[in-house]
């Protein structure tokens, strides 16, 4: 499961060959949590500021917890067929977090070794939130690589550089038939301070003093 990640620091980190339209205004968020907003690249429709988590309802109409993640092995099922054919997106991120029990919840940060952004594959829907129409997204997850496996049994689908445009190409009907995940050698992991366990903690120096903030 991926329910916490670090946003891009600045818009210029998005490759121009993926998006060359108007810049979107956003604030760096080192501890993105469900219902918060970040930039997203929308297949066939440019880019948008999007909400993390797709709202759902029980059959009786009562709200369910938002959909944060969607398993790649379930995307061919009926409820996700439309998303795969028409509603694919990419969430550019600096990295993502997972936890291990080490005398309490110990967070770890996964990112690319050279600091390039991770391009997380996602699906999206448009819905009304507090009177405002907004795109909302869920991050795709798959079997973890060898680095992530000791921390969690799933990991976000971080796309290889040469597969990002393919994922955003709605003319490509079966992108999941290809190897999409970024190579294991690209990833690095390091522990974070436990202050970030609090979703309200947005001060990067409080849990990652060695990182360079935007």
Feature-to-residue mapping (PLM):
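Short linear sequence motif anchored by a di-proline
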Residues: 1-214
